[in-house]
């Protein structure tokens, strides 16, 4: 029985590759910011549902390995839509500051 999984994975990989190529081929910081601003509304769906992004969980694992959540202060530089901060908060970290160059990404993070 063919569930079409391989076809879906190829399509998703193609989308992921296309976005990465756009990011790598930007000519200026402003162009890169515009790209992330345009992507912000669908970023979480792309990285979580489509690509299976595990960065937040890996970050939580390693921070727990080296830090105690009580009293720890975390700076999430390049926080995007706040995916890491949400996961860290669920893992007991309470003092998390996020910064990002994209105002649209920060607006998405503020919703969380």
Outline where the language-model segments fall:
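Residue-level signal for short amphipathic helical patches enriched in basic/charged
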Residues: 50, 69, 91
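Conserved alpha-helix/loop element of class I SAM-dependent methyltransferases that forms part
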Residues: 53-71
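Class I SAM-dependent methyltransferase Rossmann-like catalytic core
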Residues: 41-53
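Class I SAM-dependent methyltransferase SAM/SAH-binding core
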Residues: 75-77, 81-112
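Residues at secondary-structure transition points
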Residues: 27-30, 50, 54, 100
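N-terminal, positively charged/glycine-rich alpha-helical extensions of SAM-dependent methyltransferases
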Residues: 2-42
């Amino acid at each position: 029985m063919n569930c079409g999984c391989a076809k879906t994975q190829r399509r998703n990989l193609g989308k992921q590759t296309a976005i990465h190529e756009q990011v790598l081929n930007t000519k200026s910081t402003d162009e890169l910011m515009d790209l992330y601003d345009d992507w912000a509304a669908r970023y979480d769906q792309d990285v979580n549902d489509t690509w299976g992004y595990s960065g937040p969980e890996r970050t939580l694992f390693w921070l727990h390995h080296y830090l105690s959540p009580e009293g720890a202060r975390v700076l999430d530089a390049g926080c995007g839509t706040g995916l890491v901060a949400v996961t860290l908060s669920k893992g007991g970290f309470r003092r998390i500051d996020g910064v990002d160059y994209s105002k649209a990404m920060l607006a998405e993070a503020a919703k969380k």
